[in-house]
Amino acid sequence: MKKSKTYDIVTIAIVAALYVILTMTPGLSAISYGPIQFRVSEMLNFTAFFNKKYIIAVTIGCMISNFLSFTWVDVIVGGLSTLVFLSLGVLLFDRFKEDYFWNGQLNKAFFFFAIFFSISMFTIALELKFVAETPFLLTWGTLALGEFASLFIGAFIMDKLGKRVDLSR
């Protein structure tokens, strides 16, 4: 069966909405913003390894979620950072998608991506340095650790989900 553009738009909208919900839900929103953050929604980055259209979905979800942050600059910087580094990460690590660590428990592509994307938090640390006058290295460190933790946990969840639900459509 051939997919329609409508189907693609709807699935992109659903993933973007899930990102927003997992970021802005009371309780989760308290840990989703600022120099120390743990965004549960970041696990949705891995949907892009199943279908590249989800790069747009996650970027849109990130930008909408960042409207709740303390500055509109975060909408632009966070959105562009997500678009660029998610695209690069999929391009660099997609070839490891079928390889695993720990007897098939941890997808290598997801693990390498988690490290790469955590390092990319320098963009958000720079933003916070200029907008909120936070110390760059400390902020980068806390952002990278939070990002890695959320992606590492999300890697297990999304890999298992991807084996049960066809995320490639």
From Swiss-Prot:
PANTHER family given in the database record: INTEGRAL MEMBRANE PROTEIN, INTEGRAL MEMBRANE PROTEIN-RELATED
Classification lineage: Bacteria, Bacillati, Bacillota, Bacilli, Lactobacillales
Transmembrane segments: 9-29, 44-64, 73-93, 110-130, 137-157
Assigned protein family: Belongs to the vitamin uptake transporter (VUT/ECF) (TC 2.A.88) family.
Record has Isomerase as a keyword: no
Entry-linked InterPro entries: QueT (IPR010387)
The protein's assembly and partners: In E.coli forms a stable energy-coupling factor (ECF) transporter complex composed of 2 membrane-embedded substrate-binding protein (S component), 2 ATP-binding proteins (A and A' components) and 2 transmembrane proteins (T component), probably with a stoichiometry of 2:1:1:2. May be able to interact with more than 1 S component at a time.
Annotated Gene Ontology cellular component terms: plasma membrane
Domain of life: Bacteria
Keywords: Cell membrane, Membrane, Transmembrane, Transmembrane helix, Transport
Pfam assignment, any one: QueT
Annotated compartments: Cell membrane
Official protein name in the record: Queuosine precursor transporter QueT
Function noted in UniProt: Probably a queuosine precursor-binding protein that interacts with the energy-coupling factor (ECF) ABC-transporter complex. Unlike classic ABC transporters this ECF transporter provides the energy necessary to transport a number of different substrates. The substrates themselves are bound by transmembrane, not extracytoplasmic soluble proteins.
